[in-house]
Amino acid sequence: MVPAICRFSASLALGIFSASVAVAEPMTVGAVDKVQAHVDATQAGQVRPLLINSDVYFRDRCHSGEDARLQATLKDGTQLTLGENATLVIDEFVYDPIRPRGKLLIRVIKGAFLYVGGLIEGETGAKVWIQTPVAAIGVRGTTVWGGPIDNGYGVIVLSGEVTVIGKKRTVTLKQGQGTMLFKDGKPQRAAAWPAGRMKRAVASITFGKPPGQ
């Protein structure tokens, strides 16, 4: 089986035939599992709606609207959930199903997200990074939430371990620990979150019940 390899620095292969230029199709890296309200993706300047079973492509700019949610699963089993008014791009995806290890770089431009790790993390992780507006998050065997909350930006680990690299400080979070970043960009020391903050974080990426339920 051919490994799925997409890199941030990769250039498109161009084929020129009869004075026309054929550009390689974008590579599929996953598919949509669930959608609430309006969610779309932009690829090479073209916007398309994301629906259940829609393909997710390398370098798609996935965006959720007001009261929207998106849940997608990548080819290695990594699961990504977006809250409302969120934007995310997969900048690097290297995965070989025969050797379950590779590299994943996710850029969260805005909004709340939930990341549930897949096979790319392998035995040690360390090759999965999530870049947020205020910090870089190194992931190991992890379920992690991040997003704007309580007038700052929060990161909370539900399982596994992450390293949060902000301005002038790096913090390691283990299961049940979170951190907050405010205007100074310095992550606070790891600590359990208050119940109210935790509830708001979970609500930000939770799908609403369908009508009639």
Q: What are the residue ranges of the model-derived segments?
A:
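Bacterial N-terminal signal peptides
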Residues: S9-A19
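Elongated, non-catalytic scaffold/linker segments and compositionally distinctive motifs
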Residues: C6-F8, A37
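N-terminal secretory signal peptides that target proteins for export/translocation
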Residues: M1-A4
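Flexible, surface-exposed loop/linker segments and immediately adjacent secondary-structure boundaries
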Residues: A24-Q213
